Amino acid sequence: MEAAADGPAETQSPVQKDSPAKTQSPAQDTSIMSRNNADTGRVLALPEHKKKRKGNLPAESVKILRDWMYKHRFKAYPSEEEKQMLSEKTNLSLLQISNWFINARRRILPDMLQQHRNDPIIGHKTGKGAHATHLQSTEASVPAKSGPSGPDNVQSLPLWPLPKGQMSREKQPDPESAPSQKLTGIAQPKKKVKVSITSPSSPELVSPEEYADFSSFLLLVDAAVQRAAELELEKKQEPNP
């Protein structure tokens, strides 16, 4: 009887010892796996977070660097002395400043240059300055062309036709020389009259072909003067009553 009693006890004891372990193992496995996954997620997230912190510079430092780049946007390559000065202002290392400028020249500088081209105020200022310089150059060239006003320029004043009576009084020849003048007038060919019309801004000579009517008018005046001289000569030759 004792042996029979001991036999079932021995057969039941392993089942009783193993069954609780088998029933608890799935729950323990899932909890362990979830903890392991959470730990691995934290481990993977830490380097990313650290990288983000490394890439972000202080906003004040970035503003100082951007201002410097905008002032020197046409030559955004700071020297060693300028890097040292920026390092003191921004509290950044020389390596950080060099890396920032390398990236900024590719990403920020093109936008700055495009904004400078599209800004109407800057374009108006540059156009106004160019117009002022053009005016200064033209003002400097005008005196050289016109020259100083003096007695030499008085001689190049326009010649206007005088009235017939005044011309006859001034050019009235002597009675004795009237026949000789008539002969010379017939023998000599017609001379071209050169007329120069000038103004202070354009001292250019005018060709006589443009004023052909004016030259014929002068020839008519000369003929009238000669006729008047002939009439006076005839009056003098007539006997007094």
From Swiss-Prot:
Keywords: DNA-binding, Homeobox, Nucleus, Transcription, Transcription regulation. One of its GO terms (molecular function) is DNA binding. One of its GO terms (biological process) is regulation of DNA-templated transcription. Gene3D superfamilies: Homeodomain-like. Residues 48-111 bind DNA. May have a transcription role in testis. PANTHER family: HOMEOBOX PROTEIN TRANSCRIPTION FACTORS (PTHR11850). This is Homeobox protein TGIF2LX.
